[in-house]
Amino acid sequence: MKKILILPGDGIGQEVTNECLKVISYFQKDCEIEYTEDLFGGASIDVHGEPLTKEVLKKAMEADAVLLGAVGGPKWEQLEHNLKPEKGLLTLRKELEAFANLRPGKVFPALIDASSLKKSIVKGTDIFVVRELTGGIYFGEPRYIKEVDGKKVGANNLIYSEDEIARVARVAFEIARKRRNKVTSLDKANVLEVMQLWRDVVSEIHSNEFKDVELDHLYIDNAAMQVIKRPSTFDVILAGNLFGDIISDEVAELTGSLGMLPSASIGNKYGIYEPVHGSAPDIAGQNI
């Protein structure tokens, strides 16, 4: 028996997961699948006062997979940082150790006219973004907004350990072996020490374990330009949490719509599966 925890979340999330349930129900004819549904994100805040309760986290850790709709919306934007719907998602990823986010961005011939770029540029584009998901600046401590000498100061810390970098790099290289055998790692090693560590560790993993895979490195600002200029030349893109968050949305736009793409966040044991898009409150409830 396989167990799936369904967390519709907010906005269009309920409609999205309802459609997924039709697929799950179809496979129940031949597979033993049990699913439960619970509150998450803003929907959980409205009832329980927090985006992710201990009870829901326990259910997630007992499930074989988590199916997520979407979280967030204008209704909860003014809440304190640790009470926002997105905080529940960050905590869920961290607690399940879902350290690698996988996002494909493929331009299909039938949908090429939906792309914002010319056909001649996006034709043949098939990019797979591997984003480190449970480390980096989104989780680094200390983090604060405080007053110093009468002025507000905000700070976040961009921190990565060797192990955090190595494990997500291995995921990227393994995926590349099953595709076109190339990894492009993104960093800012020219100005950030932590990004120099990123580059060093990725290079070491490549040299010791994946010499058969082609590896190149790009600074994130140059990469953002090259993905627009020559998208079809990329295969697997490896990036840290912040850079991966940004570049994966850019890659998604090449395909024509962020709303049509899937996302998987995986670790050694757990997996979280969701659409790439947000809660889309402007069209929620319209069943489209």
Model feature map: region roles:
Residues 41, 110, 218-225:
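Short acidic loop-to-helix transition motifs that present clustered carboxylates
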Residues 32-54, 227:
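N-terminal beta-loop-helix "entrance" segment that forms/cooperates
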Residues 1-3, 30-31, 61-65, 97-99, ...:
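Short coil/turn connectors at secondary-structure junctions
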Residues 10-13, 64, 130, 172, ...:
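Buried hydrophobic positions in well-ordered alpha/beta secondary-structure cores of metabolic enzymes
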Residues 1-9, 36-38, 42:
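Generic N-terminal amphipathic, Lys/Arg-enriched alpha-helix
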Residues 42-45, 227-288:
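Glycine-rich phosphate/nucleotide-binding loop
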Residues 46-155, 242-244:
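N-terminal glycine-rich phosphate/adenylate-binding segment common to multiple enzyme folds
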Residues 5-22, 26-28, 149-221, 230-233:
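Glycine-rich phosphate/diphosphate-binding loop of Rossmann-like nucleotide-binding domains
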